[in-house]
């Protein structure tokens, strides 16, 4: 009988995970308290929303371990298009440093200024201006209407006051009788991911060329103070939902995660609910952010159900293909900046042991990582690295990243022959890391802070071919400085990371980048330190509709210096700045294209 009851419970849990988690919608609230629990969600084959009854509105400090930070500004509801029958969708929120302040060790709170002043964590003015990022996510298969309301009951203005980014994708926007904004979201097998921005809620970032300033300086970016992103995801394909049984699945219980709770079965399943790492590696309970999940080598699949919110990070040890699927959330909010898993998770950078949200350090070769659906929040460092064998590839789609305010918070490594599509990444480091051949990236939306380029292909000499990047929407940038080491550019290549190295004329990079839109005042198109040849490097259909930066800081200028013995085979076509086409007549550094390429390359490149 006990076995039958367990099987029934697991079956019910699996059924719920397959269609989404139905949780609790909002009642009355005020900052620092939980929301109410009146149920008005919906989960069906048309669309599925969910709720957390442990939502905590708190814009200043860490939330309680079992709570989820909830937007102080917005509520979101979803209806089947045209029916005006709206259901609640939880609105999450992320704040810079997660309310911890500048801390050095996870054991430091409630002290909040223990990180040495010499350490730049990438966050400066953001907390003082109240910058935050909210998001709501749901599953859908039909056209839906998404209503956005202000939590204080005030009007969000007229549709003309709303900008939806990427602007290259248009939406019908209307105003509701209760002061909200309604957006019609068409059914899309690839889903829709977009930022909803209100003209009355924009912050203009000013820089003096060294740091953000509150007066004077030059405009380097404009962002919402209270950002809101909508993730409308397709239901998971059946092949990305594991076949779970009591024998092959370790089903987690919402609440604290103690060492070993994740078991040794093939599948690790997180049903709807909130989870947090409760113990350090020695089994001591207490301070948060002192451990991560080190999976058993038997475990190859992590499934995060819609409504699962896991405060932690995942490290794989399997030798077979491995998976991270489901529309749940993996949050690094309890970790300090650059959390060093090899040194008690303190804020000391290590390229080898600082924590990744997704990690594998013992690859067996010939493996593929499948990542479909998850959202990661507040990463403390690089977000994904797999080490130990070069025979690794990835298949990544419907993958979202938010709250990446710290430095070093990049996009995932894109390994050989990887396929990445329909992603939305908020980053403060390299967004699209092109270090290997055969990769394909399509329909990527990037929200960039101020560190490193959108596309990175430097740090060492590389032999790369067969790479395509298509339909790239850069919806925000706010570079503080004109940089070439950490390029302030759309397409960048940093100089050597290691010392004592020289460019390699035997190697070359070849790729095609197409259909790029950069919104707002854009940084340079290129900042390349040549470490090898560039051969048949095609960039086509690039639009900077709002123009290039023309400030005295110089962030709008593309820079490609000379490199002895190397060639620069660039072919740029249909590049427009403010609607005007860049050509061989107006590309110059003091003209429309601000394209400063060394004269030694003349005849090797062209703009048409």
Curated annotation (Swiss-Prot):
Gene Ontology cellular-component terms listed: extracellular region
Signal peptide range: 1-19
Glycosylation-annotated residues: 39, 571, 574
Keywords: Glycoprotein, Glycosidase, Hydrolase, Secreted, Signal
GO molecular function: dextranase activity
Location(s), subcellular: Secreted
Record-linked Pfam families: B_solenoid_dext, Glyco_hydro_49, Glyco_hydro_49N, IPU_b_solenoid
Propeptide: 20-34
Enzyme class: hydrolase
Lineage: Eukaryota, Fungi, Dikarya, Ascomycota, Pezizomycotina
UniProt similarity note: Belongs to the glycosyl hydrolase 49 family.
Cytoplasm in keyword set: no
Superkingdom to which the source organism belongs: Eukaryota
Gene3D superfamilies: Dextranase, N-terminal, Single-stranded right-handed beta-helix, Pectin lyase-like
Protein name as it appears in the record: Dextranase
UniProt PTM comment: N-glycosylated.
